[in-house]
């Protein structure tokens, strides 16, 4: 009887450990993707300055100056924030 209970316990551990490890891997992957997304977002506004604002019609307008970049525009910051920003 004790041998059967011990064997069931070992089987239970073998089943639980791999599934909990997979959940940790998924969380680590999500954190890595989020960090990469916000890092890219921050890089796109570096070296940019100007007056960029949302008009009454909802469009972003203003003047932007990007040092070291040939293309600079005033546009939506990103879909989580409804503001406007200069991007290069």
UniProtKB/Swiss-Prot annotation:
One of its GO terms (cellular component) is extracellular region. Its main location: secreted. One of its GO terms (molecular function) is toxin activity. Belongs to the conotoxin S superfamily. Coiled coil: none annotated. It comes from the Eukaryota. It is found in: Secreted. Contains 5 disulfide bonds. This is Conotoxin Ca8a. The keyword Secreted applies. The cysteine framework is VIII (C-C-C-C-C-C-C-C-C-C). The keyword Disulfide bond applies. Residues 1-21 form the signal peptide. Transmembrane segments: none annotated. Residues 22-46 form a propeptide. Expressed by the venom duct. It comes from Conus caracteristicus. Keywords: Disulfide bond, Neurotoxin, Secreted, Signal, Toxin.
């Amino acid at each position: 009887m004790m041998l059967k209970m011990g064997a069931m316990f070992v089987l239970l551990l073998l089943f639980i450990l791999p599934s909990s490890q997979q959940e940790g891997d998924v969380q680590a992957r999500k954190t890595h993707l989020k960090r990469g997304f916000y890092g890219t977002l921050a890089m796109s506004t570096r070296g940019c300055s100007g007056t960029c604002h949302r008009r009454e019609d909802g469009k972003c307008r203003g003047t932007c100056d990007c040092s070291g970049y040939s293309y600079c525009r005033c546009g939506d910051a990103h879909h989580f924030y409804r503001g406007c920003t200069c991007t290069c």
